[in-house]
Amino acid sequence: MSASLNYKSFSKEQQTMDNLEKQLICPICLEMFTKPVVILPCQHNLCRKCASDIFQASNPYLPTRGGTTMASGGRFRCPSCRHEVVLDRHGVYGLQRNLLVENIIDIYKQESTRPEKKSDQPMCEEHEEERINIYCLNCEVPTCSLCKVFGAHKDCQVAPLTHVFQRQKSELSDGIAILVGSNDRVQGVISQLEDTCKTIEECCRKQKQELCEKFDYLYGILEERKNEMTQVITRTQEEKLEHVRALIKKYSDHLENVSKLVESGIQFMDEPEMAVFLQNAKTLLKKISEASKAFQMEKIEHGYENMNHFTVNLNREEKIIREIDFYREDEDEEEEEGGEGEKEGEGEVGGEAVEVEEVENVQTEFPGEDENPEKASELSQVELQAAPGALPVSSPEPPPALPPAADAPVTQGEVVPTGSEQTTESETPVPAAAETADPLFYPSWYKGQTRKATTNPPCTPGSEGLGQIGPPGSEDSNVRKAEVAAAAASERAAVSGKETSAPAATSQIGFEAPPLQGQAAAPASGSGADSEPARHIFSFSWLNSLNE
């Protein structure tokens, strides 16, 4: 306990000496005052040498000798409080010396030069002659050996002072290291928090700027809309004012003319001569009659001056504006996910519908439809004849049967001729125009005539010219195919005659117009299982015989 008290007293004395030294520092040279020390009128102290230097710096034009100002009088400012010090004819030597400060400086120098007392070994408080050499573990205080043998610590456990010293010193060192590490971590956290504060300020500033820009944009829209609506009201105002002012001008002119007539009539009433009066009265009466009959007062409608139809109701907009608030990103993400799911479902259904439409369009398209206008017209006729139910028929007899192509695919490289060069000609009676379909297909001179109609064998997509180019012996197979196709065509014609309610578009699907005479058909896209499905082809080569 005495050692701790001695240490505390020593530390207090050292602190007192340090504070005293701070008070004895000159504000000019920043060292301890040197004699003589002068006191200024403001009660601050300076070294006389420092006071002379500052006085000379404040009065550089005064003559000096040996670094001392010779002229009498002058002034300078206190370096501590900036108070102006006025000197008499003695200059800085006229300032009073501060003997108290000089004595304190002497005492301080004596104390500071005195050798330090060596710290003695601490002694026990109960046994003043015994040194403290053991440490009581129960009471946790240092004590002496006599206290352990006879004193208050005889029943306590003790340990050598050096062991406890080393242990507590290591514990203190570890604690200091832990505190230093903790301080480093805390300092890092503080740095992160400071960065977070800066980031928050920057983000808030950015969001405020964006918010202000958006509201400024809304202000601009409102201002623009206000100007537009104001212009509408202004235009209506100008139109109505122009109309009313035109009426005012019209009525004013009429009033002026009538006033002139009235004035002329009053003057004419004073005419004493009856003959003169009668000569001019007729003209005046005619003018008065015309003025009274021709003028019609145009009244303004009731409420013409009101502008109630320009009233604006902003209750809904006000409600919307008051509901403006910040949105959360979580809600937007959920809405976007829901919208994407709906779009995917619609896309799947729509994709199937688009595929079906594309297949129908592919089946109903005719190749080379836009290449030649004449060919397009002939193809349109083919479409109309391919749908007998779409045209009015005068007689129940069906049109002449046209042999379609056989369903079996033709081998690649085999070419079947078209027109009058194909197969054996046979005389078939051509029905009259009245007995057939639309008379546009059969002219008037065609009635009752018989022409040689030819039966066209199927035209394969692989045909590239006229005439038989295939391998020998293909004629018999073509004739057999033509017979089979004719039988199938008659069955189809019978079925189509019964089903007259079918639309024309359905009869066009799956049919393709045959190539014109002298023009090669498009090559087949494939053969075997990869080739296109068989198409029913109508041939109208019997129309070519009409040119004969």
Curated annotation (Swiss-Prot):
GO terms for biological process: diapedesis; innate immune response; leukocyte migration involved in inflammatory response; macrophage migration; positive regulation of non-canonical NF-kappaB signal transduction; protein K48-linked ubiquitination; signal transduction. SMART domains: BBOX, RING. The keyword Transmembrane helix does not apply. Residues 326-532 are annotated as: Disordered. Residues 484-496, 512-531 have a biased composition (Low complexity). Targeted for degradation through the proteasomal and lysosomal pathways in the presence of SUMO3. A zinc finger (B box-type) spans 103-145. Residues 168-248 form a coiled coil. Highly expressed in muscle. Low-level expression in liver. Gene3D superfamilies: 1.20.5.170, Classic Zinc Finger, Zinc/RING finger domain, C3HC4 (zinc finger). This is Tripartite motif-containing protein 55. The lineage of its organism: Eukaryota, Metazoa, Chordata, Craniata, Vertebrata.
